[in-house]
């Protein structure tokens, strides 16, 4: 049975005022509508603290990627506001690193050159030797030093995603936005890169917002998990989607993949999220 006091599940209605005051990222009443009568989602509000890792889970079409694109400055909401570090987000910025499911590497450049391109965009006046040292540091963090002078066509899918992650970290953004970055990878590669990401985030204290469909991935990586529902027709008319519930992850932050299943709160937490996806993931 779900234990609210132990697993600290909070409904959106009971917002935490103290968190909103001190939060690094603040989303206020975000809505997106392609048709005025049927918004994809509405009244989406949540926060992220500096150094926090937050995952969002929901079925396809609920608007997760749209929210991430708004946070990245790549799309505009129909209404609402996004504030990061006290300033409203307006357009793309190197202060926010983005990693998509597709690697988006420039095929004619090597790993070194792909990441150096991003570094030079961030710091145009950085001397070439320093750029090279900087690039090598972040390539090493994702375990690709041996492939640094290879082109994308010479890399596996997992290696390409590692390059994308290294590139995002190399510009030292204030926030990292991940849109299902491991969704196209096999289970073994996905697990390996998840572990690498977890260690890098812990070492750098990076703030991360990540979309995933993988419940275990969210439980492993996230401090909090946002459960998002789809818009739906109801007897009272159409109700748009939104954030239905915010779940605080009660598991210790030093959790590991191998030890996850042995933690007392793992199965109650997992069962609650799965139950939401199966029975409550549409607006009522």
Where are these regions (language model features)?
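The feature captures the beta-strand-to-loop junction immediately N-terminal to the Walker
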Residues: 57-59
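Conserved ABC ATPase "signature" region
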Residues: 127-147, 199
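Helix-to-loop junction immediately C-terminal to a conserved catalytic motif
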Residues: 72
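Catalytic Walker B motif of ABC-type/P-loop ATPase nucleotide-binding domains
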Residues: 176-179
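Short coil-to-helix segment of the ABC ATPase nucleotide-binding domain corresponding to the Q-loop/switch region
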Residues: 109-118
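Conserved ABC transporter NBD signature motif
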Residues: 80-92
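Conserved signature/switch motifs of ABC ATPase nucleotide-binding domains
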Residues: 150-153, 171
């Amino acid at each position: 049975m779900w234990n609210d006091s132990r697993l600290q599940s909070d409904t959106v209605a009971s917002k935490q005022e103290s968190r909103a005051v001190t939060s690094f990222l603040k989303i206020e009443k975000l809505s997106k509508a392609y048709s005025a009568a049927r918004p994809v989602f509405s009244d989406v509000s949540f926060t992220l603290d500096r150094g926090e890792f937050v995952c969002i889970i929901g079925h396809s079409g609920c608007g997760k990627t749209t929210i991430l694109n708004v946070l990245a400055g790549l799309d505009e909401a129909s209404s609402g506001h996004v504030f990061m570090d006290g300033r409203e987000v307006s357009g793309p910025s190197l202060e926010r690193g983005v990693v998509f499911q597709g690697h988006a590497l420039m095929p004619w450049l090597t790993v070194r050159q792909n990441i150096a391109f991003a570094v030079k965009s961030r710091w145009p006046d950085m001397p070439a030797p320093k750029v090279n040292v900087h690039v090598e540091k972040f390539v090493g963090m994702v375990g690709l030093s041996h492939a640094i002078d290879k082109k994308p066509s010479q890399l596996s899918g997992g290696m390409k995603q590692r390059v994308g992650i290294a590139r995002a970290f190399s510009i030292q953004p204030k926030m990292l936005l991940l849109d299902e970055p491991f969704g196209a990878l096999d289970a073994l590669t996905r697990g390996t890169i998840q572990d690498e990401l977890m260690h890098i985030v812990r070492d750098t204290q990076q703030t991360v917002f990540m979309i995933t469909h993988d419940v275990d991935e969210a439980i492993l990586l996230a401090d909090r998990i946002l459960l998002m529902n789809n818009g739906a027709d109801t007897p009272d008319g159409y109700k748009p989607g939104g954030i239905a519930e915010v779940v605080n992850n009660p598991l210790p932050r030093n959790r590991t993949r191998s030890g996850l299943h042995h933690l007392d709160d793992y199965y109650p937490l997992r069962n609650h999220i799965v139950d939401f996806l199966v029975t409550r993931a549409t607006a009522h």
